[in-house]
């Protein structure tokens, strides 16, 4: 017990020092030129490509440990890096580099009758703490996005991706050095100890301005319950697709299979399929067969079970489950009203899609469902900052304060007011 207490003290002391250094780095970073930040990001991307072999070797260690632990295949997919994924990671950083620098942007401006000129201007948030689990690419995305927005960042990756994340972080540090920016602007917690998470949630004596958790329900719940600083919550992606009677069948089949099976382990993967009861004969069998043929397990409501014998019966637990695997729950609903009721009952407010040709159905879907991302005639797998033209994302925020949807460069800023006068005094 005494050893544990001493160990926690050591971790807390280390984290406080990391916080102090991050806060110190945030000051010059907030005023760094757009050109210097661009140079750092381009250099980071180049180093990542150059060190592909080192990153893959580190990832192999993480994969070996994960397989020995007996984790699910979907987890392995999220953890796995390949040459192609590393190239994509570098391309993502380059895309972030080419975004317009948000810092200093005048969001709005106006003149008062007394002659005062008021501007609302974008500013960095300061120091951001990012806590994530198995995806090593978050290291690159989060580091690059925070830098572009003029923020320092403290990264705490999961123990499962520890070696991969450290190898990627070394590339980011090298890019900062090349551009002459503080290397402490992007720091990674060098231990897998869970006490480090607890320390970050305290705010590190005022060093951390906001926490971004990216991971499973238990991680996000812990952060929301214990954090003493603001949180951009990235909840589970319990995403729905509703196929209306007015939908084009071939389009519906293509979108449904892509939304579920393109990458089953990402938060934008569809987890529940809702089919308009009025068009069950037209859609049910073709859609379910397409999913099964693609290797997906379908868990169906009782009224769908007769369409394809042998399907597993869905329970209430299924409607509340983010599978992150080749599994989907499916049911018939009473048109758009039934779809809205189901989604508003079970959704995690992440992403929902409607496949329909009836404009009235689409309008009701968009106006009566309050999730962060709503799509019409498109796959839920477009729920991604890169696909939104943001260059990347730290996560998909499902709350309603400050940031919502993909958390990109713009969402990682705050604002201040600049007021210009000519000698005015208040009467």
Curated annotation (Swiss-Prot):
Its EC number is 1.2.1.41. One of its GO terms (molecular function) is glutamate-5-semialdehyde dehydrogenase activity. GO terms for cellular component: cytoplasm. It is found in: Cytoplasm. It holds the Pfam family Aldedh. The keyword Disulfide bond does not apply. PROSITE patterns: PROA. Keywords: Amino-acid biosynthesis, Cytoplasm, NADP, Oxidoreductase, Proline biosynthesis. GO terms for biological process: L-proline biosynthetic process. InterPro entries: Ald_DH/histidinol_DH, Ald_DH_C, Ald_DH_N, Aldehyde_DH_dom, G-glutamylP_reductase_CS, Glu-5-SA_DH, GPR_dom. It is an enzyme of class 1 (oxidoreductase). Pathway: Amino-acid biosynthesis; L-proline biosynthesis; L-glutamate 5-semialdehyde from L-glutamate: step 2/2. Disulfide bonds: none annotated. It catalyses: L-glutamate 5-semialdehyde + phosphate + NADP(+) = L-glutamyl 5-phosphate + NADPH + H(+). It comes from the Bacteria. Belongs to the gamma-glutamyl phosphate reductase family. Catalyzes the NADPH-dependent reduction of L-glutamate 5-phosphate into L-glutamate 5-semialdehyde and phosphate. The product spontaneously undergoes cyclization to form 1-pyrroline-5-carboxylate. This is Gamma-glutamyl phosphate reductase. It comes from Rhizobium meliloti (strain 1021) (Ensifer meliloti). The lineage of its organism: Bacteria, Pseudomonadati, Pseudomonadota, Alphaproteobacteria, Hyphomicrobiales. The gene is proA.
């Amino acid at each position: 017990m005494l050893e544990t207490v001493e160990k926690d003290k050591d971790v807390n002391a280390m984290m406080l020092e990391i916080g102090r250094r991050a806060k110190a780095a945030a000051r010059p970073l907030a005023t760094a030129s757009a050109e210097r930040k661009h140079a750092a990001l381009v250099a980071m991307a180049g180093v990542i490509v150059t060190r592909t072999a080192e990153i893959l070797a580190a990832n192999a260690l993480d994969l070996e440990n994960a397989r020995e632990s007996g984790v699910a295949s979907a987890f392995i997919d999220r953890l796995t890096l390949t040459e192609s994924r590393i190239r994509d990671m570098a391309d993502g950083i380059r895309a972030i580099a080419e975004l317009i620098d948000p810092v200093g942007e005048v969001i709005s401006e106006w003149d008062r009758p007394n002659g005062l000129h008021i501007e609302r201007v974008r500013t960095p948030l300061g120091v951001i703490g990012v806590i994530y689990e198995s995806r090593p690419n978050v290291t690159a995305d989060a580091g690059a996005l925070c830098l572009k927005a003029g923020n320092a960042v403290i990264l705490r990756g999961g123990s499962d991706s520890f070696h991969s994340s450290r190898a990627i972080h070394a590339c980011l540090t090298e890019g900062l050095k090349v551009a002459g920016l503080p290397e402490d602007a992007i720091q990674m917690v060098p231990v897998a100890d869970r006490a480090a998470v607890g320390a970050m949630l305290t705010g590190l004596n005022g060093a951390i301005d906001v926490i971004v958790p990216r991971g499973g329900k238990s991680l996000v719940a812990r952060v929301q319950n214990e954090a003493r600083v603001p949180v951009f919550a990235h909840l589970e992606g319990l995403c729905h697709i509703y196929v209306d009677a007015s939908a084009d069948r071939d389009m519906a089949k293509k979108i449904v299979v892509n939304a579920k099976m393109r990458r089953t382990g990402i938060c934008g993967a569809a987890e529940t399929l809702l089919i308009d009861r009025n068009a069950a004969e037209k859609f049910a069998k073709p859609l379910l067969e397409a999913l099964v043929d693609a290797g997906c397990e379908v868990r169906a409501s009782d009224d769908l079970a007769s369409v394809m014998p042998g399907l597993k019966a869905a329970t209430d637990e299924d409607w509340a489950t983010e599978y992150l695997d080749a599994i989907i729950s499916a049911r018939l609903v009473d048109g758009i009203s039934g779809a809205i009721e189901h989604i508003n009952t079970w959704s995690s407010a992440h992403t929902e899609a409607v496949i329909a040709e009836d404009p009235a159905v689409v309008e009701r879907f968009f106006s009566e469902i309050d999730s962060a991302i709503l799509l019409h005639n498109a796959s839920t797998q477009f729920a991604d900052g890169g696909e939104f033209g943001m260059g990347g994302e730290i996560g998909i925020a499902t709350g309603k304060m400050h940031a919502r949807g993909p958390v990109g460069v713009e969402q990682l800023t705050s604002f201040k007011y600049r007021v210009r006068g000519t000698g005015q005094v208040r009467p």
